[in-house]
Amino acid sequence: MTQTLRLTALDEMFITDDIDIVPSVQIEARVSGRFDLDRLAAALRAAVAKHALARARLGRASLTARTLYWEVPDRADHLAVEITDEPVGEVRSRFYARAPELHRSPVFAVAVVRETVGDRLLLNFHHAAFDGMGGLRLLLSLARAYAGEPDEVGGPPIEEARNLKGVAGSRDLFDVLIRARGLAKPAIDRKRTTRVAPDGGSPDGPRFVFAPLTIESDEMATAVARRPEGATVNDLAMAALALTILQWNRTHDVPAADSVSVNMPVNFRPTAWSTEVISNFASYLAIVLRVDEVTDLEKATAIVAGITGPLKQSGAAGWVVDLLEGGKVLPAMLKRQLQLLLPLVEDRFVESVCLSNLGRVDVPAFGGEAGDTTEVWFSPTAAMSVMPIGVGLVGFGGTLRAMFRGDGRTIGGEALGRFAALYRDTLLT
């Protein structure tokens, strides 16, 4: 029997015909051995059976329909796996260049890249149904099913979890105003945003290019020691990214503007089920720094921490719910100001870059001939013409993995590798 779920306004944000936006979310795992394809197919079937939106498809709507729905069949329609031995860089560029088809279940795609030192499993999720944490949750179910291990699914029923107003909305207008006050400074400071200098891009080249970067545990310890008191690793990572942009532009003789900013996706699932429930729970905050303030890593990190701390305390990440599903509660003037913060609405307010951090993850071994899980990678929906680089962070096995995704029309693969190397130097020296 097919279940239906009304699309949330947040889901609808990523159902778009804008050719500048490809709402694909990358999750990738590497194993020490080789996947058995029959066993992997069985694990996929078991994994999607655990999560409603993992086997959903977008329902067909009439021209007069006011509401869109997900259709959740008992079984997924199409669980094909692409198998290739092409270079993984080429596969990534091709595989993530298109978002999965919405009207076919499931709204994600799977590829296995055969390599001599261990297979790679690439998962491409449509952001309308999955955020990064949701994609990671499916990877966990897949690994456990492949290994024959139990997979307890947490969180409330899917209908309750997707009541965004109940999960993250303001309780009253007073709460809205507290959030709006926290968002006011970034909006004011966002004057003349610095854009990443283009290098090597081509309209005829790949839509996306990728540059993976690994920071080993001893190197990460050195970087973390540079944090000012009260700052998080994420604050440090964002500050290093802002500094990298300014240094990159200097080497390209491109003057900085007034501000440099980072689009920071935020998982607003409640703490009790922060890593559970597959759906789109990603809000966005703008971390905006004045260029004249960004002089060194320690100072920039302190400034970022001074911005993120109050935003977390006020629950400001819920602003997107207040705006998109707030109904008539919001005063018209406040609603208009919040609309200007939407990352996909007006080019002049899209940030310099995007950085999304899944935190430390524990993906178990797939077992059998696949062996151990040796690497986990992630990159968000981000890279577009005005915000050409998105970075996904994952802590796994004592290392920090940073996947840089670039808009190939603006920045070439070799150039993105140099940008990633410059980020590494900024973070560690």
Swiss-Prot record:
SUPFAM superfamilies: CoA-dependent acyltransferases (SSF52777). GO terms for cellular component: plasma membrane. InterPro entries: CAT-like_dom_sf (IPR023213). This is Uncharacterized protein Rv2305. It comes from Mycobacterium tuberculosis (strain ATCC 25618 / H37Rv).
